[in-house]
Amino acid sequence: MSTKIILVVDDDLTHLKLMRKLLGKLGHIVVTTDSAEEAEHILRYEEHFSLIITDLRMPWLNGLDFCRRMKILKPDLKIYALSGWVYNFGMNELEDAGFDGIYQKPISKANLEEILNADI
């Protein structure tokens, strides 16, 4: 598996640390942020990312709206929803937002590998 540059967006700092550790151990470069607004800034002006893993329920800009905006800005970028609140949203709403995959927290190792191997 090639090294990926992954942006993880979640307002839960404990989850960000966990994802950084898990993905880092798998040999990937991980950038984390606790807000979709900052993530949008990073994507507009900074690095090239292989994929994004984002929470859905965040203050100010939620994961749905963040995904919609990023798919306009970077339509080929893979964006995955990872949330403890997946079932609070309609699947059509999530798919229409443009997510490439939707996963429930806590993510299993198999699902994480599915995300990482999706674009090989």
Language-model features and meaning:
Residues M58:
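Receiver (REC) domain active-site loop signature in two-component systems and cognate sites
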Residues L13-V31:
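Two-component/phosphorelay signaling modules centered on CheY-like receiver
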Residues G63, E95-D100:
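As written
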